[in-house]
Design a protein with these regions (language model features):
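N-terminal Sec-pathway targeting helices
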Residues: 2-17
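Terminal hydrophobic membrane-targeting helix
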Residues: 19-121
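Small-residue helix/turn framework positions
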Residues: 63-86, 105-123, 146-161, 167-184, ...
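Short, surface-exposed linear segments at secondary-structure transitions and domain or protein termini
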Residues: 92-98, 222-226, 434
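Intrinsic-disorder/low-complexity linker and hinge segments
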Residues: 130-141
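Gram-negative outer-membrane assembly/targeting C-terminal domains
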Residues: 431-446
Length: 446
């Protein structure tokens, strides 16, 4: 057989294949939107949820694709009226070879401006979970999509309250761009899935978890066994930056999360602005490490059950309501406050460990270098709204007082050594109204 003849047969074969594809697609190409109702019915049967499609079209650049405009999937009746997902436009690129066998295989998906709203019911299920197919054929399973791209997306997660009323949003991400590989669309909606359902990269202009905000976030992301895992996270937050990992688990009656974060250059005053009860309570620049985890409860305060540990340092700040330097000097009966006169509440350096357990912070080793006063201590503070303080330790004051003042201070319980007066102290009351005393009990400082 000559080369020319083989070439001719090859061209004829290709032409025949294209003809078969054309016959299969011709009705769709002439008016794709006429199949919109059938596609909606199919998707509703497959997902068990109400589906909306504004318009269907076929495009040829950069490849053969179905374009879906104004796509929406509504939450099931168990949930308040809402959408699970709304997408302005979806471009689904098809595998032409599979069409020869009358099979529809999606090679890639591009989602323009998707809004994803995930809601958990107190009894356990999420609004996106698939209750199971309802007598629909399995000739077109979504399966694994090789590539999924998200452009300008938004995601929110929230819980319903025990009354089934809408609860607060505990996680949200805005201006999302993401590229994912090998996304198992069927498994994501399957509550029994244990597979790796996709992985890739993610960028977000703004991410908020509880009251904590991060901007210009970049991370790797993995969807696996009902979990979303963010790794190699880098973000800007409160004038500084943060790195670490975050995972959110969506299985079980309550969702749960775990984070391991490292922070540097955080503006404490800006950070506390997110917490109404803590605004204006402290300033300074903070750095440190935190590991926090917990269940996300179906309540108006879904993150109140958190627990964790870490170590923080804050430099060049103050705690206005405590007036720590001045109050401790008065407690020692010092009339000349020295540097504390001009900086009654300021400090050079604070270093502390911490353990968080249901809105109470416990610190075993606290080191504070103030102006004229240094102290070592330990104690607890409540974050539940009472702001209750319970701290104790030993304060050390550089002694530049006269003989009589030093004598009175020593008689009051202090110890003078190397021109430094040290004495035990206790701080009770609240952050706004602290009560200073010697030891565990003593005279209140006015």
């Amino acid at each position: 057989m000559t080369i020319r003849r083989r070439t001719g047969l090859t061209l004829v074969g290709i032409a025949c294949a294209l003809f078969v594809v054309l016959i299969f697609l011709l009705p769709l190409l002439l008016n794709a939107d006429r199949y919109r109702t059938k596609l909606v019915s199919y998707l509703e049967g497959k997902t068990g949820k109400k589906v909306e499609i504004g318009r269907l079209a076929v495009t040829f650049s950069p490849g053969l694709a179905i374009q879906v405009n104004d796509f929406g999937v509504k939450s099931p009746p168990l949930f308040p009226p809402s959408y699970i997902v709304k997408v302005a436009r979806i471009d689904a690129q098809l595998d032409v070879r599979s069409l020869l066998h009358r099979q529809v295989v999606i090679k890639s998906l591009v989602l323009e401006q998707p809004t994803i709203n995930l809601v958990s019911d107190p009894d356990g299920p999420w609004n996106f979970e698939n209750p199971g197919p309802q007598n629909t054929p399995s000739t077109f399973p979504f399966g694994v999509v090789s590539r999924v791209e998200i452009r300008r997306g938004h995601v929110t997660l929230s819980n319903l309250l025990p009354s089934d009323a809408a609860g607060p949003v505990f996680f949200e991400a805005h201006d999302i761009s993401s590229e994912l590989e090998n996304v198992n669309v069927d498994a994501i909606a399957d509550p029994a899935s244990t597979t790796l359902d996709g992985e890739g990269t993610l960028k977000a202009g703004l991410l908020r978890f509880g009251s904590i905000e991060a901007k210009n976030l970049i991370s790797s992301i993995r969807l696996q066994a009902r979990q979303v895992l963010f790794t190699d996270v880098k973000a800007e937050t409160d004038g500084g930056n943060a790195t670490g990992e975050l995972s959110i688990k969506l299985s079980g009656k309550n969702a749960s999360f775990k984070t391991d974060a490292r922070m540097k250059g955080i503006d404490v005053a800006h950070l506390l602005m997110a917490f109404p009860g803590a605004r204006g309570k402290m300033t300074g620049k903070m750095e440190g490490e935190l590991k926090i985890a917990g269940e996300i409860e179906h309540s108006r305060h879904p993150l109140e059950g958190l627990h964790g540990s870490g170590h923080l340092t804050v430099r060049n700040g103050d705690v206005p309501s405590l007036r720590l330097n001045a109050n401790l000097m008065k407690l020692a009966h010092y009339n000349d406050l020295g540097p504390a006169k001009n900086d009654p509440s300021s400090f050079n350096f604070v270093s502390t460990d911490l353990e968080l357990d249901r809105e109470r912070i416990t610190s075993k080793v606290i080191d504070i270098d103030g102006y004229g006063v240094d102290l070592d201590g330990s104690g607890t503070v409540s974050l539940s709204g009472s702001d209750e303080l319970n701290y104790q330790g030993v304060a050390e004051i550089v002694s530049q007082q006269g003989f009589v003042t030093n004598l009175i201070a020593r008689l009051a319980g202090g110890t003078l050594k190397d021109s430094k007066l040290s004495f035990p102290f206790h701080i009770g009351g609240t952050i706004d109204s602290p009560v200073f005393a010697k030891g565990s009990k003593g005279k209140k400082v006015n």
